[in-house]
């Protein structure tokens, strides 16, 4: 009799849990963004928010928790209640670069999160000063090889993805660049435009107007496919650096023990939103290409990225504490 009562209780609890998940969501859903308002992540999720809320039948509440290159907000997501009402935004910074370079990270990017879907990617643009005597990537490499350190490179933020892109370029091209550190990407673009700096990897949205106006030259983009907003600009991969990829990406994740049924539902809704032509166009205006995935595909992407940046860090000695040295040496 006691066993029968326990079995009935377990059945009731399971039925109740299944019912709660099938009725989800019954209240507003929180999205924790580990970066401030106006950031790449914030702009992207607010574009998604307009369509995702109505599809779920509940409001999407944006909660910006910035600090420590996104690590603080990501830790908040990892520790949040796994009840289906807390989701987070993951980026290269929080889920591949930091894990690869920071052994003291308070969260595990794979174990502490349930993967939902990749949302979008935004390649960097390799731009040069307008009068640099190089019209292609190969001409730039030839110029840099002619004299070590002759080509200057703007690096914004130590151990940032843009910094790692420069390290990867130097390594794969076999060149040595003179590194000039900047605190502001806006200032570095202006200095490239004025000729004070030879080249840099610039974020798509802010550099696009300068490229289209001819104030800087765009030699290549860092994605494996050409950017829709710059269809005539080749990728570094097709320009001779086979396999080069260093795009900004953004994804939706949840606390690790979030019920699979809720994760699957959120994945379906995010993918549906990213198929909406209005959303695709709004993202594209920000230099972002919609790139929805399955949870498994997102997990594989993060796993591969961590391995890539960890390998680069080991080979170059770069870390979260790296200070600009004035040059980026080629791999020997």
Language-model segments: residues:
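Bacterial N-terminal signal peptides
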Residues: 5-16
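C-terminal lobe and pocket-closing loops
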Residues: 207-275, 307, 321, 329-332
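Stable alpha-helical elements in mature extracytoplasmic
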Residues: 40-44, 48, 69, 73, ...
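N-terminal (or domain-start) structured segment
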Residues: 20-111, 150, 174-199, 210, ...
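Hinge/capping helix and adjacent helix->loop/strand transition within the periplasmic-binding protein
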Residues: 52, 79-85, 92, 100-187, ...
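An extracytoplasmic/periplasmic, membrane-proximal ligand-sensing/linker region
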Residues: 26-28, 172, 212, 260-332
């Amino acid at each position: 009799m006691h066993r029968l009562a326990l079995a009935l209780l377990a059945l009731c609890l399971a039925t109740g849990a299944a019912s709660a998940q099938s009725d989800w969501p019954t209240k507003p859903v929180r999205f924790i963004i580990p970066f401030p308002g106006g950031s790449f992540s914030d702009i992207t999720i607010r574009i998604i928010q307009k369509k995702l809320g109505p599809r779920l039948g509940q409001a999407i509440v944006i909660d910006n928790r910035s600090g420590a290159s996104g690590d603080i907000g990501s830790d908040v997501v990892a520790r949040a209640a796994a009840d289906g009402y807390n989701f987070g935004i993951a980026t290269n910074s929080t889920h591949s670069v930091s894990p690869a370079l920071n052994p003291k990270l308070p969260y595990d990017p794979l174990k502490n999160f349930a993967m939902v879907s990749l949302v979008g990617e935004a390649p960097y643009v390799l731009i040069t000063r307008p009068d640099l005597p190089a019209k292609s990537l190969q001409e730039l490499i030839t110029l840099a090889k002619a004299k070590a350190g002759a080509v200057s490179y703007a690096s914004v933020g130590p151990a940032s993805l843009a910094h790692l892109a420069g390290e990867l370029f130097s390594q794969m091209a076999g060149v040595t660049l003179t590194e000039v550190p900047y605190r502001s990407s806006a200032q570095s673009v202006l200095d490239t435009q004025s000729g004070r700096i030879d080249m840099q990897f610039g974020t798509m949205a802010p550099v696009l107007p300068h490229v289209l106006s001819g104030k800087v030259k765009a030699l290549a983009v860092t994605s494996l496919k050409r950017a829709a907003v710059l269809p005539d600009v080749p990728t570094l991969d097709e320009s001779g650096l086979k396999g080069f990829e260093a795009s900004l990406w953004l994804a939706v994740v949840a606390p690790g023990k979030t019920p699979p049924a809720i994760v699957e539902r959120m994945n379906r809704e995010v993918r549906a939103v990213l198929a909406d032509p209005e959303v695709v166009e709004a993202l594209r205006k920000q230099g972002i290409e919609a790139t929805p995935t399955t949870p498994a595909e997102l997990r594989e992407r993060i796993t591969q990225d961590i391995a890539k940046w960890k390998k680069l860090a080991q080979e170059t000695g770069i870390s979260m504490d790296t200070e600009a040295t004035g040059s980026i040496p080629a791999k020997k």
